[in-house]
């Protein structure tokens, strides 16, 4: 649920605001009710007692919002279900309004408002607490500074220009708020200077809990609908004061009564929509006016006489703002279509149909224009509702299953029969009673005659395609150059003293929209990426905290590539004649063959130019990132991520970087170059007559599969810039490439049909991941294109984040697949064409098949594979989606990727190269073992736990343990949530695991403990399984949510020599580790490494509270400090030095530790002296008082001079004893930071070669 508090000051008194708000609600309700599909019905309007806010007025309304929703929402809902109910309680100066949709049970919009005569300075008027207060976003709306743009701007409503004739108020200056507050503060309003000031405090809670749509719709309502409507409405409240000034509350009530009667007559079809206000060229609803004291319109409407309308007592008003921004470009005829007025009769010059007949036709049908066909079965209205409710119920159940508390209930699917019946009947092509409209685009069918069609009469003509796009109300973006999202200005380079770039992974999101996006706006792209970034951070904070601040996500916006394809296919639809396109009801999308859209899109003459723009935009984003503070000195890995259409552009760009062109044989990876020809210099499929015009060349290309998927020769006006030799290439190297619901394999399959011998172009990246939902109508598998053997193998199922947040450990490597399925890769035993073997017979033969997989088979598969892992990954989606119409799914799936924790957790596991926290870096090349929970998450033992832990991140911690062999080996940990330990995990199960053979051993389960009331557990390893010498990783996992804490236990022999470092005293050159990243003292890391190389055990101590453990360890890891054992204070301590002393004394006296040297600040001298250390063993950096200088060795020349002395002869000696044999040499590991990309690629190749060598030796 998103919570946002709006504070809207206005130069009115509280009582004037009340009159203005109620007047405009009534006025706009009357003006903007057009009948079916757009209007308001007032059901109840009566006083109440002892309700919200005390006594007031209760109103219940029904808003018909069908004409105001964007297409991606309307595609999910039937027309007959597009209503919103409002309940409003108006107990002025408190109001509350709640909006619900009977069809969407998990949707709600709740708005509370308080009105105070101030300037908005009160911080918490709603008395919020806990997570509500933490998650609240405050947004101050200034009616003067916050301007409207484009068609929303009306000069007469601009407070900078408006002057009231009745009151003489206005105009308002930029600093009006400060001026008015100085005038009215502490005075009675209005003042003698006729100045007043009040503020509406509105808190809005939006919830839309359905799979794949929650975040996008909640942000859509907040960012687009609510704020935009409130700004415009309050500007109107000020600019329309000449109409409402002087009215009393009795006048308002009479207006409401008359409006209720008028609306009942209009919405019931009892009068024609001939009122002047109805024909205004804008579409807006009074629902918005109710919550914003006004509503949207394109230009000023004539004042309504004070015969009033209804009272929408709630100052909050309507939530049908959900789609009102789509109406900006609507024309009068589009409004008429949306309200059921038949335009086909007007076009043909015939008489207008009756209103009742128009409403009846508007209620028919389900899929766009096809809905106008007559259906002989029952009532379409009731049945659409039944089907739609069935669908959304299935989505709701799946949404609930993702919550913290899981329920396992049965679903009653008895309605399947009715659904099957509905599907078959709806697809029958009945004739239409109405005469065909004249003047339609039927003549476009003559395009098949290439030489006879005139240019302006072709559906392939650019003028026609642009006209189709403009009639939808969308701006055509194909010709416009891609704009780059520069979220920050160029900043100067970082400080030269910065040791390393904070960003280790850069993710570039190539966003071109879904397959049905004719022209997506930049704001929508930014919203998707913002949602993705927020979801990414939430998952990292919960389970991958070491990656926080090290991953940067940038957007590469791309023009839409489907505009022409959608225009052509919708024109070819059998139902293209039925209605004209409009923004309110995009036609024929349900009738378009979705699978053909990407094929026509890549065949567009503009496709290669769009790829050039995409590459240029990606390069600009990359270079801007390098200039920014977060990217200065960046040398990490770059990950590219493409959505449905963006993946096609990204693939072409990556193939260019490889020196190949996907559309040519020369671009084939590992294929013979002698057969390659340049498509621009000579192409056997090019038209014989080079002088053919563009339309003829397009049709010629349409006759051949190869030319269908490779863009025709560029038009003459830009042929020089589109040659392969001048094609733009990426300026950086991509590590991993993720595709979301991509149709790439279909495009490549069609290319393969033309030349079966040519290999498919391989993108220039290390690994490709093809993520898709099985029910997605455009997504398809990629692996069978590279090897037919994989058509038998199922794609990898991405584990559910709700059950396996750290992954389930399933094998992903290509060689692991060959090993686990040898029967499919054996040349001698062709099981592809044979009978299916039983499990018993297959088990008996597999042992012989594993050794018989030939080295040539493995080598051939690796050569043509796009990485070292599997390529196809199937995502979970609710079963109810299979019952949605195909045209509704692309929008839904496209929105789901940006907020899916399954997708994000999978990406993190791949780019981080680990699925748990790895052991310390070692000098060998062995891979670190990954941790995978052995079982899915369980329900919490205490019911309140899931409620308490919502919206808070885990902050578990455990100090490292040093114990002498033979003594008790006890592990202690504390499990808390929130940055300041606000929530304690009480009475819940925690699993304790340990790795006995580090660094690449197996995790061993030790025990399950239950936390006490303080969130602590204490576990002692039994003597019979106690551990010998060594340093062992320990992981404690919370059973309920799989959050975990990591620590190390060191079992050491007596007289183990160590070196102690105080983190704050000896490492940091600034005061705080918790604020900005502090600088490291020069040479500190080198001194630590010197002692480690001599075999000493390193111990890091700090008096900081253990709640800061994750942040401090991450800081040490970022700066590559060698591994050591860390000790924090237990909670907030008033004596941090005493904690250090007690800790070191315990090690020396009880565990036989010998401290050779100790480093710190002047404050640490007393600590080391109390432990019994000599002056020549204590090294102090920084300023030291004269009284203490004799108690320690002061490093006045810094670490550099000290290190030189240590490295000199006699300066230091190697550690003695057996302890140095068990102490590893390495650093704290941070994913993506410990090894550079080139070395990682070398190790991967080395591993693959080793595996192949093993197979060869076995054979």
From Swiss-Prot:
Q: Which domain of life is it from?
A: Eukaryota
| UniProt feature, compositional bias: Polar residues | 679-689
| Coiled coil regions, renumbered to chain | none
Q: Which InterPro entries match?
A: DDHD_dom (IPR004177), HAD-like_sf (IPR036412), LNS2/PITP (IPR031315), PI_transfer (IPR001666), PI_transfer_N (IPR055261), START-like_dom_sf (IPR023393)
**Expression by tissue:** Expressed in adult heads, not detected in bodies.
Phenotype seen when the gene is deleted = Flies exhibit rapid light-induced retinal degeneration.
Tell whether Calcium is among the UniProt keywords: yes
Effect ascribed to mutating residue 95 to C: Increased phosphatidic acid binding but no effect on phosphatidylinositol binding or transfer activity
> Is the keyword Plastid assigned to this protein?
no
Task: Output the SMART domains linked to this UniProt entry.
Answer: DDHD (SM01127), LNS2 (SM00775)
**What does the record give under GO molecular function?**
metal ion binding; phosphatidic acid binding; phosphatidic acid transfer activity; phosphatidylcholine binding; phosphatidylcholine transporter activity; phosphatidylinositol binding; phosphatidylinositol transfer activity
What segments bear the compositional bias annotation Acidic residues? Answer: 318-335
Q: Pull one GO CC term from this UniProt entry.
A: cytoplasm
Q: Which GO terms describe its biological process?
A: calcium ion transport; cellular response to light stimulus; G protein-coupled opsin signaling pathway; negative regulation of opsin-mediated signaling pathway; phosphatidylinositol metabolic process; phospholipid transport; phototransduction; phototransduction, visible light
Q: Residue limits of the DDHD domain?
A: 730-913
Biased-composition ranges, Low complexity, are 284-293, 347-363, 663-678
What are the record keywords, sorted? Answer: Calcium, Calcium transport, Ion transport, Phosphoprotein, Sensory transduction, Transport, Vision
Positions of post-translational Phosphoserine modification: 274, 277, 401, 403, 434
Which Gene3D superfamilies does this one have? Answer: 3.30.530.20
Family, per entry:
Belongs to the PtdIns transfer protein family. PI transfer class IIA subfamily.
Which PANTHER family did the record assign? PHOSPHATIDYLINOSITOL TRANSFER PROTEIN, PROTEIN RETINAL DEGENERATION B
Task: Quote the protein name from its UniProt record.
Answer: Protein retinal degeneration B
Organism, as annotated: Drosophila melanogaster
């Amino acid at each position: 649920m998103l919570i946002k508090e709006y504070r809207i000051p206005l130069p009115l008194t509280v009582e004037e605001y009340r009159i203005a708000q109620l007047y405009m609600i009534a006025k706009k309700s009357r003006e903007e009710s057009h009948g079916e599909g757009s209007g308001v019905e007032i059901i109840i309007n009566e006083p109440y007692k002892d309700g919200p806010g005390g006594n007031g007025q209760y109103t219940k309304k029904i808003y018909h919002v069908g004409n105001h929703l964007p297409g991606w929402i309307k595609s999910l809902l039937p027309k007959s279900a597009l209503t919103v109910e409002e309940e409003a309680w108006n107990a002025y100066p408190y109001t509350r309004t709640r909006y619900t949709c009977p069809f969407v049970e998990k949707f709600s919009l709740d708005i509370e408002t308080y009105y105070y005569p101030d300037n908005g300075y009160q911080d918490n008027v709603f008395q919020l607490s806990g997570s509500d207060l933490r998650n609240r976003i405050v947004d101050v709306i200034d009616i003067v500074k916050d301007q409207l743009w484009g068609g929303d701007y009306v000069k007469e409503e601009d407070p900078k220009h408006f002057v009231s004739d009745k009151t003489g108020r206005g105009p308002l200056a930029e600093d009006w708020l400060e001026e008015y507050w100085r005038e009215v503060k502490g005075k009675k309003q209005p003042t003698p200077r006729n100045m007043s000031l009040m503020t509406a405090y509105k808190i809005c809670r939006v919830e839309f809990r359905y799979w794949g749509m929650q975040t996008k719709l909640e942000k859509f309502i907040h960012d687009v609908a609510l704020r935009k409507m409130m700004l415009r409405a309050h500007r109107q409240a000020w600019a329309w004061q000449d109409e409402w000034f002087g009215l009393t509350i009795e006048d308002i009530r009479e207006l409401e009564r008359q409006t209720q009667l008028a609306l009942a007559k209009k919405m019931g079809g009892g009068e024609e929509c001939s009122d002047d206000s109805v024909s205004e060229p804008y579409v807006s609803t009074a629902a918005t006016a109710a919550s914003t004291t006004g509503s949207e319109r394109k230009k000023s409407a004539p004042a309504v006489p004070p015969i009033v309308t209804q009272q929408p007592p709630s100052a909050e008003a309507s939530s049908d703002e959900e789609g009102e921004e789509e109406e900006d470009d609507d024309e009068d005829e589009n409004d008429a279509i949306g309200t059921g007025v038949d335009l086909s009769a007007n076009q043909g010059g015939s008489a207008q149909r009756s209103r009742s007949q128009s409403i009846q036709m508007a209620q028919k049908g389900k899929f766009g224009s096809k809905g106008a066909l007559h259906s002989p079965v029952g009532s379409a209205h009731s049945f659409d509702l039944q089907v739609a409710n069935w669908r959304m119920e299935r989505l709701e159940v799946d949404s609930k299953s993702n919550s913290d508390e899981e329920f396992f209930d049965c679903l009653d699917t008895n309605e399947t029969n009715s659904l099957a019946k509905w599907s078959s009947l709806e697809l029958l092509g009945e004739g239409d009673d109405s005469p065909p409209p004249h003047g339609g685009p039927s003549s476009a069918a003559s395009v098949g005659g290439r030489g006879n069609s005139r240019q302006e009469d072709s559906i392939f003509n650019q003028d026609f395609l642009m006209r189709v796009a403009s009639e939808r109300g969308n701006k055509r973006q194909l010709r416009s150059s891609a704009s780059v999202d520069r979220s920050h200005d160029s900043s100067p380079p970082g400080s030269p003293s910065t040791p390393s770039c904070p960003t280790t992974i850069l993710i570039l999101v190539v966003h071109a929209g879904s397959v049905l996006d004719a022209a997506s706006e930049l704001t929508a792209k930014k919203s998707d990426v913002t949602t993705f970034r927020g979801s990414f951070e939430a998952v990292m904070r919960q389970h991958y905290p070491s990656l926080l601040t090290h991953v940067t996500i940038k957007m590469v916006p791309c023009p839409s590539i489907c505009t022409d394809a959608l225009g052509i296919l919708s024109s070819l639809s059998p139902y293209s004649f039925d209605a004209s396109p409009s923004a309110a009801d995009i036609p024929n999308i349900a009738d378009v063959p979705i699978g053909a859209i990407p094929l026509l899109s890549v065949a567009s003459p503009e496709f290669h130019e769009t790829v050039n723009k995409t590459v240029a935009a990606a390069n600009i984003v990359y270079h801007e990132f390098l200039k920014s503070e977060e990217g200065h000195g960046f040398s990490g890995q770059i990950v590219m991520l493409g959505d449905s259409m963006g993946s096609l552009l990204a693939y072409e760009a990556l193939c260019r970087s490889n020196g190949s062109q996907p559309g040519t044989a020369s671009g084939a990876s590992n294929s013979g170059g002698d057969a390659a020809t340049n498509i621009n210099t000579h192409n056997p499929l090019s038209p014989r007559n080079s002088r053919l015009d563009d339309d003829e060349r397009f049709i010629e290309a349409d006759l051949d599969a190869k030319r269908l998927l490779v863009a025709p020769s560029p038009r003459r006006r830009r042929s020089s810039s589109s040659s392969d030799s001048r094609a733009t290439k990426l300026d950086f190297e991509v590590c991993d490439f993720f595709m979301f619901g991509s149709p790439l394999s279909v495009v490549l399959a069609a290319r393969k049909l033309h030349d079966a011998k040519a290999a498919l172009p391989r993108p220039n990246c290390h690994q490709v991941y093809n993520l898709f939902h099985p029910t997605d109508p455009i997504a398809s598998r990629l692996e069978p294109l590279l090897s037919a053997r994989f058509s038998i193998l199922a794609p990898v199922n991405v584990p559910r984040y709700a059950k396996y947040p750290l992954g389930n450990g399933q094998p992903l490597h290509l060689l692991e697949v060959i090993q686990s399925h040898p029967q499919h890769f054996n040349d001698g035993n062709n099981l592809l064409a044979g009978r299916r073997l039983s499990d018993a017979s297959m088990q008996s033969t597999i042992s012989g098949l594993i050794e018989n997989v030939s080295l040539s088979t493995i080598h051939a598969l690796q050569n043509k594979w796009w990485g070292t892992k599997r390529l196809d990954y199937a995502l979970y989606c609710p079963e109810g989606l299979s019952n949605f119409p195909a045209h509704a799914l692309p929008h839904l799936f496209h929105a789901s990727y940006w907020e899916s924790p399954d997708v994000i957790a999978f990406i993190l596991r791949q780019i981080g190269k680990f699925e748990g926290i790895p052991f310390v870096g070692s000098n060998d090349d062995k891979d670190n073992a990954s941790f995978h929970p052995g079982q899915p998450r369980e329900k919490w033992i205490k019911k309140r736990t899931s409620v308490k832990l919502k919206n808070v991140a885990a902050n578990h911690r455990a100090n490292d343990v040093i114990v002498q062999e033979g003594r008790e080996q006890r592990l202690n940990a504390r499990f808390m949530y929130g940055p300041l330990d606000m929530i304690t995990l009480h009475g819940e199960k925690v699993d304790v695991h340990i790795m006995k053979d580090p660094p690449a051993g197996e995790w061993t389960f030790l025990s399950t403990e239950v936390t006490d009331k303080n969130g602590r557990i204490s576990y002692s390893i039994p003597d019979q399984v106690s551990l010998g010498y060594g340093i062992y990783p320990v992981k404690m996992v919370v059973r309920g949510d799989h959050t975990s804490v990591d620590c190390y236990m060191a079992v050491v022999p007596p007289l183990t020599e160590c070196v102690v470092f105080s983190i704050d005293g000896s490492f940091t050159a600034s005061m705080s580790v918790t604020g900005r990243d502090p600088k490291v003292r020069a040479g500190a890391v080198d001194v630590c490494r010197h002692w480690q190389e001599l075999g000493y055990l390193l111990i890091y101590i700090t008096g900081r509270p253990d709640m800061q453990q994750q942040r401090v360890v991450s800081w040490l890891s970022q700066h590559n400090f060698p591994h050591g054992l860390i000790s924090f204070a237990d909670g907030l301590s008033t004596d941090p030095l005493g904690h250090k002393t007690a800790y070191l004394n315990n090690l020396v006296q009880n565990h036989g530790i010998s401290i050779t040297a100790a480093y710190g600040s002047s404050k640490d001298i007393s600590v080391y002296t109390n432990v019994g250390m000599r002056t020549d063993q204590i090294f102090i950096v920084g300023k030291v008082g004269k009284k203490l200088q004799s108690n320690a060795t002061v490093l006045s020349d810094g670490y550099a001079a000290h290190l030189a002395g240590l490295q000199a002869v006699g300066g230091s000696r190697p550690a003695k004893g057996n302890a140095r044999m068990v102490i590893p040499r390495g650093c704290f590991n941070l994913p993506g930071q410990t090894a550079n990309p080139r070395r990682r690629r070398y190790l991967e190749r080395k591993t693959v070669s080793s595996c192949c060598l093993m197979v060869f030796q076995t054979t």
